């Protein structure tokens, strides 16, 4: 019988490359979360600054004058920051859960989810995968003889 050896790195799903990949996905999500939290804090501070609190003997129904252009620009920047932070959190969190790191992986998993199963034999294999497949085929062919 042919004695074929597989390394732990070739078989394990928890190899060094896998851990680095998952750490990169985690860091992307945490950076998006930090962006969202910072933009929420800035928006909250901006709202506190606009609050009109009259002093004693000042009218409480007459707010002080303000710039409409400045308010519109500030609202646009704060709204964009909140929307961008929330969207990136959703995208990177979903990719972290689904173990997606690249656009080709995303398109492959989306096609598989939609029911269009692509033939995996047409996909290119890396050298380690082809090595393992060849070794398994050798083992199976030797057992049949």
Swiss-Prot record:
Q: Which residues cross the membrane?
A: 26-48, 76-98
**Gene Ontology terms, cellular component aspect?**
membrane; mitochondrion
Query: Where is the protein situated, by its record's location annotation?
Result: Membrane
Please indicate if the UniProt record lists Membrane as a keyword: yes
The protein's UniProt keywords, in alphabetical order, are: Membrane, Transmembrane, Transmembrane helix
Membrane topology per record: Multi-pass membrane protein
| PANTHER family linked | ALTERED INHERITANCE OF MITOCHONDRIA PROTEIN 11
Record's family? Belongs to the AIM11 family.
Kindly provide the name given to this protein in its UniProt entry: Altered inheritance of mitochondria protein 11
Q: What is the organism of origin for this protein?
A: Zygosaccharomyces rouxii (strain ATCC 2623 / CBS 732 / NBRC 1130 / NCYC 568 / NRRL Y-229)
């Amino acid at each position: 019988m042919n004695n074929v050896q597989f390394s732990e790195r070739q078989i394990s799903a928890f190899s060094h490359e896998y851990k680095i990949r998952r750490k990169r996905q985690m860091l992307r999500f945490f950076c998006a979360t930090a962006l969202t939290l910072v933009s929420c804090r800035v928006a909250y501070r901006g709202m506190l600054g606009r609050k009109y609190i009259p002093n004693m003997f000042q009218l409480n129904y007459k707010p002080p004058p303000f710039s409409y252009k400045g308010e519109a620009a500030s609202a646009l920047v704060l709204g964009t920051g909140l929307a961008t932070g929330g969207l990136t959190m959703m995208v990177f969190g979903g990719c972290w859960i689904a173990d997606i790191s690249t656009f080709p992986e995303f398109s492959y998993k989306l096609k598989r989810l939609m029911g269009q199963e692509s033939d995996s034999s047409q996909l290119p294999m890396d050298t380690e995968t082809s090595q393992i497949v060849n070794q398994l085929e050798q083992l199976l062919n030797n057992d049949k003889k």
